[in-house]
Amino acid sequence: MKRIEIFTDGACSGNPGPGGWGAILRYNGTEKELYGGEADTTNNRMELTAAIEALEALKEPCEVDLHTDSNYLRDGISGWIEGWKRNGWRTADRKPVKNAELWQALDEARRRHKVHWHWVRGHAGHPENERADALARAGMAPFKKKKGGDTASSEEGSARRR
C-alpha cells in the first residue's frame, strides 16, 4: 500500500463569507496541489472540504498521513464522529451536527484508506501548512469582493482546480 502525505488548510474571509481550501499530496518526492473555493461558506466547511478533496483525489487505497491545523477536523474525525453516527447525526445534547453532509462525505472518503490524522500549529512557519494556506487563499480569491463591490464567482458559486 502506497504511503501518502497530505497537508490541508481552509480559509474564509468573513466566516461566513467567501472561502477556499487547499491541499498538498506528496508521494515518493512528487507533489500535487489542489485548491478550490466557494462564494459563501465557513472556515470549518473549507477545512473539511480540503480533507475530502485530497482523499478523493487518491486513485487507489493508500496509507495516509494527513496533516491539518484544524482542531475541529482532527477532533471530529478522531473522536466525535462515531458518537454522531450512533446518535443519528446528532450531538450529545441532541442538536443536529453542523456540516453533517461534509462529515458524512469525509467518513466515506476515508473508508478505503488507512488515515493517520496529525495536528500542526497553523501560521507557525510549518512550510507545508503555509503552502496549503496559500492554496486555500488562492481558492478563495475569485470569490472575494473586487473594487467597486462586485463579487467574482463562477456560475455555481464554487470552483475546484486539480
UniProtKB/Swiss-Prot annotation:
Q: Which residues form the RNase H type-1 domain?
A: 1-141
Keywords, in A-Z order: Cytoplasm, Endonuclease, Hydrolase, Magnesium, Metal-binding, Nuclease
Q: Name one GO cellular component term.
A: cytoplasm
Question: PANTHER family, alphabetically?
Answer: RIBONUCLEASE H1 (PTHR10642:SF26)
Provide the GO biological process annotations. DNA replication, removal of RNA primer
Q: Where is this region: Disordered?
A: 139-162
Q: What reaction does this enzyme carry out catalytically?
A: Endonucleolytic cleavage to 5'-phosphomonoester
- In which residues is Mg(2+) 2 bound? D9, D133
**What binding partners and quaternary form does the record give?**
Monomer.
For this protein, what is the EC number?
3.1.26.4
Quote the function comment for this protein: Endonuclease that specifically degrades the RNA of RNA-DNA hybrids.
Q: Copy out the cofactor comment.
A: Binds 1 Mg(2+) ion per subunit. May bind a second metal ion at a regulatory site, or after substrate binding.
Q: What is the protein named? A: Ribonuclease H
Gene Ontology MF: a single term:
RNA-DNA hybrid ribonuclease activity
Annotated source species: Chelativorans sp. (strain BNC1)
